Structures are given as structure tokens and as C-alpha cells.
Amino acid sequence: GLIAGMDIGFEDGGETTRAALVLLEWPSLTLIEQVVHREPTRMPYVPGLLSFREIPAALGAFEPLSQRPDLIMVDGQGIAHPRRLGIASHLGLWLDLPTIGVGKSRLCGQFGDVPLEKGAWTPLTDRRREEDPNDVALDERGRVTIGAVLRSREGVKPLFVSPGHRMSLDGAVDWVVRCLGKTKLPEPTRLADRLASRRGSVATTGQLPL
């Protein structure tokens, strides 16, 4: 199988959108392909609608890939979003692929204490919103579970994991834990994050030495 990792950001004061994409082989997590795609930002920043600003470059990064991934991990949110449509959900809808949001910070919701051991998690819950389906499951407080606050490494702040598209919460957590190495981030988003932070404006495609 193939797992993709994606990191989207802005450059030139927001004028340029940059999407960094890595494609890894599962289960070895060997890097097969990587792409950095830049294009002019088409939409102004609107709170709650950031994914609409990010999606054109994100989709553009997938075009040169020689193979289609089976799963995508995105640095950002899935349904752990006020409109239940973070960038991971949005991208999954466009590509019709399973996606997982792996956020370094919380966008919305509440959570209790996160256990200290690696792989442990606590639910991220939010009040019910009109975007939630009619048959959404509610906890004993009448709240919706929108993600997991995951201890990905002992002694480090947790990650905010949420299903994006075609993915359950348990499945999302399981995949992230299986892709953890020695650092806080799972390998797909760690490598995408590293690729995104490389200096220089050269668009790269293909396999590069790690």
C-alpha cells in the first residue's frame, strides 16, 4: 500500500500557496516520491474557510504523482473543525480517498487529561452543530466526538487527530500510531513538514535522497 503525507502553507505574505506532498510505501514507510507545488493564492483568508484557500495547491501537488495513494495524512484538521470540513476532509472529498487530519494544535472542541504513555488518547468533543448529521452519536453530555487528543510521544504535547473522509476515528488513531517513529509526528506528515520547510523556490518532483 501507499500512504501520502501533506503539508500546506503560504509564502510571500500569503500571495503564494505551497503544498508539500510525500508518498511512502507501507509498511516500510520508505519515501518513494515527493512534490512541492506552488501556485498563486486565489482566495482571501476567511475565518473557518481556510481549506478553500488551501485546496487548489493541494490538488495541484497530486497531479504529477505516478501512483495514487491508498491513504492521505494531512497536517491540519479533518472533522475537528467548526464546520466539520477541515483541509483533510475537504481534500478527501475532492480525491475520494481516505484521509486523516493530524493537527499540532486544536481548532475547536474540548478535552480532558491526556494519558502520559505513547499511543494513549482522550476524546476531543464539541457541542452539536448544524453541520453534524441527524444521526450523529452523542456522548453522555450530549456532545459530539470529533477527534482524538493523542499522546504521540512521552513528554511532548499531544496531537489532534481527526477523521477526514472515508475514515473512522478509531481507524484514524490506529493509522497515526502505526506510522509513529521516534518523533512527535507520524512519518507521513513529518516528512511532508520537513519537505515544506526546505528553503528555495525550486519545485521538485521525484525521488530525492533523504
Predicted regions and their residues:
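Two-metal-ion RNase H-like nuclease active-site motif
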Residues: 1-11
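A glycine-rich, hydrophobic loop/mini-helix early in the fold
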Residues: 12-68
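Short, well-ordered, mixed-charge alpha-helical segments that flank or form enzyme active sites
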Residues: 13, 80-83, 107-111, 156
